[in-house]
Amino acid sequence: MTRQSATLATPSDENAHPVRARIIQHARQHFLMHGFRGVSMDDLAVGLGISKKTLYAHFASKAEVLKEVIHTKFGEVEADLERLASADGASFPSRLQQLLECLQGHLKEPQPPFMRDMQREPEMFAWIQTLRRERIQRHFGKLFEEGRRAGLIRKDVPPKVVIEILLGAIEAVINPQKLEELELTPKTAFPIIVTTVLQGILTDKGRS
């Protein structure tokens, strides 16, 4: 697969085309649940009940379909995080909890078969890691800075360090092999990791 840009472009108007949108939705459900390496364009066409000609009229290859699935997924992540981070009147603990719950919810969708396939596509995997890092740094970094100024996060722990710890925790949560070793699932692992991280960075005031 070709090298991807680190940022996501604004979704094009053609994504609003009902057939194209249906292709993306069908591929998303299948890819994220069962993986994508064993799926052909023929399989997608059959599953959608459309001709290969129609499928290829919208996407030139499976790689393009996969890229659009990821584009759509991270567009939703960005919109949700932005909405929660900019909520007026919400306290620091409330906003942090909401952001973490949002992140956990989005991490539930990609299943181990997808992650295994993705790890065999180094450039695409690196692109996803970059997209994830950008969003966590932007939304959580800003919130951690606010919490630090309010005396809710320890001043001796730089927000950048907290971000790296959180990113490392997420990498562990979505690594199928690591989860198998720990006998955990993403659903059970994420709360454990988050609780451990937060207990280490919050002040007594932040925990109260």
Predicted regions and their residues:
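Hydrophobic alpha-helical connector segments
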Residues: 68, 82-109, 159, 163-166
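Basic, helix-initiating cap at the start of DNA-binding domains
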Residues: 1-34, 38-47, 63-67
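Short secondary-structure transition hinges
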Residues: 104-141
